[in-house]
């Protein structure tokens, strides 16, 4: 390859692979992360993930599992006001492919609903206080397989995102992730 073309590719290509760095504030709960080991390494496991938690980090890593795997995580935020829960299950289909499922929930429970606190006569009635929850959910399903070369793995992840804020509001969303891993063992 000519040096000028190589220089151009090295200059332009990194602009397209910054998908992990782009953030917005919608569904920010999906950026918290899973797996204590991965979080302890400052989330630098995208290229090396090869277990059930690959459904979150890089679905291509699911090809690395040999047997059924499960993962459960719980974390409390803001002195226990908010809770983050994660559960995942993965299994190999054959030597070349695997499938996984996961659910993530980030929620605040037992929020006081005071919209009915004052009755029609303007009196405060504490019996009208009720509780509600505000929660975000992500349901994921992933498939991964070895491609033409045994060293090249490909994975895809489809997710459905659900937000529920008591009886006041709810919404649905969806997304897709794709990942590749190349491992060269000489």
Regions found by a protein language model. Give the residues of each.
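Bacterial Sec-dependent N-terminal signal peptides
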Residues: 1-22
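Subset of outer-membrane beta-barrel
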Residues: 20-186
């Amino acid at each position: 390859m000519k040096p000028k073309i190589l220089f151009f590719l090295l200059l332009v290509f990194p602009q397209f692979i910054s998908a992990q760095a782009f953030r917005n504030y919608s569904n920010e709960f999906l950026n918290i992360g899973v797996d204590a080991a991965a979080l302890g390494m400052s989330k630098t496991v995208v290229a090396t993930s090869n277990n059930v938690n690959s459904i979150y980090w890089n679905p291509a890593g699911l090809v690395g599992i040999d047997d059924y795997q499960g993962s459960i995580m719980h974390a409390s935020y803001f002195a226990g006001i908010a809770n983050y829960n994660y559960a995942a299950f993965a299994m190999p289909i054959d030597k070349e492919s695997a499938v996984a499922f996961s659910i993530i929930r980030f929620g605040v429970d037992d929020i006081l609903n005071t919209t009915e606190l004052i009755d029609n006569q303007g009196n405060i009635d504490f019996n009208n206080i009720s509780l509600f929850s505000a929660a975000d959910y992500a349901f994921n399903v992933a498939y991964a397989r070895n491609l033409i070369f045994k060293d090249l793995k490909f994975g895809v992840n489809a997710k459905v995102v659900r937000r529920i804020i008591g009886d006041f509001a709810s919404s649905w969303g969806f997304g897709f992730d794709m990942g590749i891993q190349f491992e060269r063992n000489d």
